[in-house]
Amino acid sequence: MAFDAAMSTHEDLLATIRYVRDRTGDPNAWQTGLTPTEVTAVVTSTTRSEQLDAILRKIRQRHSNLYYPAPPDREQGDAARAIADAEAALAHQNSATAQLDLQVVSAILNAHLKTVEGGESLHELQQEIEAAVRIRSDLDTPAGARDFQRFLIGKLKDIREVVATASLDAASKSALMAAWTSLYDASKGDRGDADDRGPASVGSGGAPARGAGQQPELPTRAEPDCLLDSLLLEDPGLLADDLQVPGGTSAAIPSASSTPSLPNLGGATMPGGGATPALVPGVSAPGGLPLSGLLRGVGDEPELTDFDERGQEVRDPADYEHANEPDERRADDREGADEDAGLGKSESPPQAPTTVTLPNGETVTAASPQLAAAIKAAASGTPIADAFQQQGIAIPLPGTAVANPVDSARISAGDVGVFTATPLPLALAKLFWTARFNTSQPCEGQTF
C-alpha cells in the first residue's frame, strides 16, 4: 500500500508539472519557488511520498491562478469602460478617422497574452490608451478624432514593440497588425497634409509657429529600427493580403553588390573601426542629427560635371603650378577664384532644398529637386546609377582615385570616401539593411 501511495503521488506530481508547463508555455515554470534540493527530489526515484506531497502542494500553491481563474480585475474593467467610452464618442461621426481610431483602441485594449512574456510592454501601452480616452472630451468632434489619431500615430513604435515581443494569442496579434498597418497608412496621409500647410504651423499643444527656414512640425513617428521588419520576415503568416505592410517596405531594393559608388560621399568611422557609407550631398540624416554641412548651398559643392569620363576630378593646371607656394598665397588665389565663380553663377539662384519621404516613413532633405528625384527613384527600386543618370547627375566609376585626400577629423558631407565594399547613401543603406538582413555590415578600408 505504501508503494502504491508513493506511485500515485509521483504520478500526480508529473501530471501537475505537465499542466503547468502546457498552460504557461515554459518547460521550467514548475521549478519557480522550489529549492535546488526540491527540484532534485522530483527527479529522484527514491524520494519519499511525504516529501513529494509537500512539493506537489507547493507547486499548486505557487500556480494557483492556473487552477482557480481569478475574477476579472480592475484593469480589465477599466479597459472595457475605455472601449465603451471611445465607441460612444466616435459613433457620433461617420468618418474614416473615427473608425480607424476605434479600430486601434479596440485592438490594443482587447489584446490578450498567451504567457506572461512581454506583458509589461502591453500593459503599459493599454494603460496609456485608457488614460488618453478618459481625459479627452472632444472625441465626438472631427477635430478631436483627428488630434487623437495623431496621438495614436505617436504610438506606432510601441504597438510594433508589443507585436514583436509580447506573447500574444493569434487573434490579438492579427488585430494589432491590422491596426498598425491602417495607422501607418494614415500617418503618411497626415504627413502629406502637414507638408501642404507649409512650414509655419502651430502644434496641438499651443506651441509657437516654426520659422520659415525650418521644417514643418509633424506628428511623432516610429523610428525605423528593424524590430517590426524582422518580425514580418520571420513570421510570413502576418503578411496576409489584408495585412501587407504599407509604404513598400518589402519592395525591391537594389543589391549592394551591383550598386556603384556615388560622388561626394562622406565617410564616418564606426566604433568597430570600419567605415560606414555616408550621406549624399544635401541629404539630412533621419531624426535631425546635427551633422555639419548637411544643408550647404548647391554652389558650395563641387560641380558634378567636373569629372572626366574615367571619373577623375578635372583640376585647373594652375593648381599644380602653385602647389608648392605658401598657404597664404594659395588662399588668396582660391578667394579670387571663388569671387569669379560667384559672378559667373549669380544669374541662376541656388535651388531650394526638397523633402523626400522614404518607403520606411523617414524623411530626408535633398539639396535640389534633381537629387530628390534620384533618391526617390533609387528608394523605389531603380538601380542607383540609372536613378542619378536620369536626372543628369554624373557618377564617377568605382575605384576612382582620390584627388584631394583630407584628414579624417575634417570629414563632412560632400567629401569622397574610399571603401572596400560598395557604399550606399545612408538613408538607402539603412532601409536595405533593415529589410533584408536586419543588421548592418560596416565597410572596411581607408577613409579620406
Swiss-Prot record:
This is Uncharacterized protein MT0029. It holds the Pfam family DUF4226. Residues 187-221, 243-270, 291-361 are annotated as: Disordered. It comes from the Bacteria. Residues 243-261 have a biased composition (Low complexity). To M.tuberculosis Rv0025 and Rv0739. Residues 187-198, 307-334 have a biased composition (Basic and acidic residues).
